[in-house]
């Protein structure tokens, strides 16, 4: 399922930007900077303090893993500090993932 980058950017601004940045060299906020997200293992953004749950999950971020994670983060990684409840609509998750893919590499 391919998403709409413009809609994904809007979703990022509304739901994610309070805690995350996407640009290369962007600062960590409450959540880590997301530059280089795709292909990276959970809990590996340099200079960010992760929970053991994030560090030990050991999955690689991809369109597929993000699709599941973003639906219910606490179910996918029990013990994560991310307090975001998740995005129930699959199309909205696809849009957000399309935006993240275009803006984090």
Swiss-Prot record:
Domain of life assignment: Eukaryota
Gene3D superfamilies per UniProt: Cytochrome c-like domain
InterPro entries: Cyt_c-like_dom (IPR009056), Cyt_c-like_dom_sf (IPR036909), Cyt_c_1A/1B (IPR002327)
Name of a matching Pfam family: Cytochrom_C
Binding positions (heme c): 16, 19-20, 82
Recorded GO CC terms: mitochondrial intermembrane space
A GO MF term: metal ion binding
Signal peptide: none
Subcellular location per the Swiss-Prot or TrEMBL entry: Mitochondrion intermembrane space
Keywords, alphabetical: Electron transport, Heme, Iron, Metal-binding, Mitochondrion, Respiratory chain, Transport
PTM description: Binds 1 heme c group covalently per subunit.
Record family assignment: Belongs to the cytochrome c family.
Database matches in PANTHER family: CYTOCHROME C (PTHR11961)
Function field: Electron carrier protein. The oxidized form of the cytochrome c heme group can accept an electron from the heme group of the cytochrome c1 subunit of cytochrome reductase. Cytochrome c then transfers this electron to the cytochrome oxidase complex, the final protein carrier in the mitochondrial electron-transport chain.
Protein name stated in the entry: Cytochrome c-b
Gene: cyc-B
């Amino acid at each position: 399922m391919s998403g709409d980058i413009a809609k994904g950017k809007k979703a990022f601004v509304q739901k994610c930007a309070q805690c995350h940045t996407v640009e290369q060299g962007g600062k960590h906020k409450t959540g880590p900077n997301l530059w280089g997200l795709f292909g990276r293992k959970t809990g590996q953004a340099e200079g960010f303090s992760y929970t053991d749950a994030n560090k030990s999950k050991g999955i690689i971020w991809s369109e597929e893993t993000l699709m599941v994670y973003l639906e219910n983060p606490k179910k996918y990684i029990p013990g994560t500090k991310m307090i975001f409840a998740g995005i129930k609509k699959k199309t909205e998750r696809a849009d957000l993932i399309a935006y993240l893919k275009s803006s984090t590499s």
